From Swiss-Prot:
This is NAD-dependent protein deacetylase. One of its GO terms (cellular component) is cytoplasm. It catalyses: N(6)-acetyl-L-lysyl-[protein] + NAD(+) + H2O = 2''-O-acetyl-ADP-D-ribose + nicotinamide + L-lysyl-[protein]. InterPro entries: DHS-like_NAD/FAD-binding_dom (IPR029035), NAD-dep_sirtuin_deacylases (IPR050134), Sirtuin (IPR003000), Sirtuin_cat_small_dom_sf (IPR026591), Sirtuin_class_U (IPR028628), Ssirtuin_cat_dom (IPR026590). It is found in: Cytoplasm. The keyword Zinc applies. NAD-dependent protein deacetylase which modulates the activities of several enzymes which are inactive in their acetylated form. Deacetylates the N-terminal lysine residue of Alba, the major archaeal chromatin protein and that, in turn, increases Alba's DNA binding affinity, thereby repressing transcription. Belongs to the sirtuin family. Class U subfamily. Binds 1 zinc ion per subunit. Its EC number is 2.3.1.286. Residues 3-252 form the Deacetylase sirtuin-type domain. It is an enzyme of class 2 (transferase).
Amino acid sequence: MGNGECLEGGRKAAVILTSSRHAIAFTGAGISTESGIPDFRGPQGLWRRFDPALASIDYLNTDPKGFWEFYIERFRVLNNARPNKAHLALAELEKLGIIKYVITQNIDNLHQSAGSINVIELHGNYTTVYCMRCKTQYPFTLALRKYEEGENPPRCPKCGGILRPNVVLFGEPVNEINRALEIAALSDVALVVGSSLTVYPAAYVPLVVKEHGGRLIIINLEPTDYDDYADVVLHCSASEALDLVLNEVKGIMAAGN
């Protein structure tokens, strides 16, 4: 999509958002690639290089040492990442009263780092770990330090149980999905950013908005199966598209005052 098409799509999206009553953002891995975090299913995606089974609860239970060897490198990448313009734009749209919730599939904590307040994390957050035995929670940096000191798997200082990341692994339920779907059913606009809408049940969230008579905006570099279902589609980078949308929203709001 060229700059002209992105600009036109950004304007249309801004009009929809400024006229909304309760808009939500739904974000996937594509919003964080510009922060240096690889996505999962793209050409350089994580699951093209590694077996997804390495991120399963079964693997953690059967080989916690191997699990941590795989995850520690990914967590180091997350720990070094910083919010990009797309995260910052969503946070500003929330401050302007446009976006009511950010519902994310990501575990990278970048929405909170950018200043978003109402964030629902469907798949958890990498910044904490907890003991599989006593459930005591600790900062991820404690597990990282223990691992770097040669303790693999890292263990709970309190009871000696194995520590695990506070994220949803393959084979585990998505506990926050019901809350997200309830919010979606009350919303009139879903702004999808950086998601191919192929991972369920998470992908149901923006679709519920549309099914309840709301509007659907999709910002994703690659086409999705729901592009024809959407009201506006922008095949642009997340930061470029959201920068356009934010500026257009500000212009519309200024003109209305």
